[in-house]
């Protein structure tokens, strides 16, 4: 289910059960020992439990006399939104990217290492989110968009009445550019690297600077420089 309304997302986060998932590695005399609602792997002498921090702590305290060693791993605290299950996507998702649940990713899209995609975001068919780029909550990329390395599409949850960022089809956004809340970037526009876009961008233009201004219409030379490579999107 895709959540794109700010009020719905806020309600979802409020109502979600906040958990701290952990991996608990334990050695000892563990025959018959279990943790409620946990997944367990291993033997009676050495086990891995997938559980929560609270249940892990209770288990360790209750069974201290038979446990010889333990180790706890975790990467979040009281998290409300899980990561997206990407196993069924017809897209290329590289390791080290962070994609939260309730995100929509189209066919042949690419999400590179270090990219962050927040709840309610949309990535259209054939679009690429390059290394360390960020798509904030409700940010929308159309089809065949390139979001350059380190670029930011600002998220909009607060204030909830503000419109999300919309990047239309065929837009090229250079490295480290920032698209601020509520901005719409028109079809086939180009945003130069390092630009800060504070207002809507018409289709088919090139903008640059801080704040970004129109510097020219997109021409043949610009199209050649910003051409997408289909081979990067093939699966």
Swiss-Prot record:
Keyword Glycosyltransferase: no
Stored InterPro entries: DapH, DapH_N, Hexapep, Hexapep_transf_CS, Trans_hexapeptide_repeat, Trimer_LpxA-like_sf
EC code: 2.3.1.89
Catalytic activity: (S)-2,3,4,5-tetrahydrodipicolinate + acetyl-CoA + H2O = L-2-acetamido-6-oxoheptanedioate + CoA
Pfam families in UniProt: DapH_N, Hexapep, Hexapep_2
This protein's UniProt keywords: Acyltransferase, Amino-acid biosynthesis, Diaminopimelate biosynthesis, Lysine biosynthesis, Repeat, Transferase
Enzyme category, top tier: transferase
Gene Ontology MF terms: tetrahydrodipicolinate N-acetyltransferase activity
Example of a GO biological process term: diaminopimelate biosynthetic process
SUPFAM superfamilies: Trimeric LpxA-like enzymes
Keyword Transferase attached: yes
UniProt pathway annotation: Amino-acid biosynthesis; L-lysine biosynthesis via DAP pathway; LL-2,6-diaminopimelate from (S)-tetrahydrodipicolinate (acetylase route): step 1/3
Family statement drawn from the similarity comment of this UniProt entry: Belongs to the transferase hexapeptide repeat family. DapH subfamily.
PANTHER family: 2,3,4,5-TETRAHYDROPYRIDINE-2,6-DICARBOXYLATE N-ACETYLTRANSFERASE, ACETYLTRANSFERASE
Role played: Catalyzes the transfer of an acetyl group from acetyl-CoA to tetrahydrodipicolinate.
NCBIfam families, per the entry: DapD_Ac
Name of the molecule in the record: 2,3,4,5-tetrahydropyridine-2,6-dicarboxylate N-acetyltransferase
Organism, scientific name: Exiguobacterium sp. (strain ATCC BAA-1283 / AT1b)
